[in-house]
Amino acid sequence: MPYRLVKQVRGNEVLRKSFMELAMKTFSLNFRRWCEDGYWTERYIPYVLADGDRVIANVSVNRMDMLWRGQAKQYIQIGTVMTDEAYRGKGLSKFLIETVLHDWKDRCDAIYLFANRTVLDFYPKFGFVKAVEHQQSFSLAPQPGDFQKLDMQNERHRQLLLDCYHLAN
């Protein structure tokens, strides 16, 4: 394959910027603020193919610690699967998914993804099976209280959220 495989672009400014541009172009997904605010950690691992300094395809690994029936588990969520329009039809996503599955099959308890309708026939080629999703909703009446909406642009508010998160995990 004439393209370069890179298994993390967080520390590479040129490839990180190109990854973000492809995500915006493909999904209108803006990673810039998420990255600048410190939420992009070593647990989010883009596997990219680069043509020079340009990211042309990506499959991301998101390492997630879960508690399932009282047991600690490490799951891998695959996401941000994308290929630049000019490079589609060359098997780049297939190569990246196979690489991710090879790298992680013995290092986690399960691998999963969420697929939109346009790619439901693509993922079974890699052993993924369709699962029924459930969504529950209910109405809530407003409750009086001294609640404060957090502003994620405010450093103190972000730190408060992280402190609460760490207390529960």
Put a short name on every predicted segment.
Residues Y3-V81, N169:
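A conserved beta-strand-loop-helix scaffold within acyl/acetyltransferase catalytic domains
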Residues V14, T118-D121:
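Short alpha-helical
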Residues M64, N116-V119:
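An acidic- and aromatic-residue-enriched active-site/binding cleft used to recognize and process polar
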Residues T83, G89-H102:
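Conserved acetyl-CoA-binding loop-helix of GNAT-fold acetyltransferases
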Residues H102-N116:
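Conserved GNAT acetyl-CoA-binding A-motif
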Residues Y123-P124, F128:
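Conserved active-site tyrosine of GNAT-family acetyltransferases
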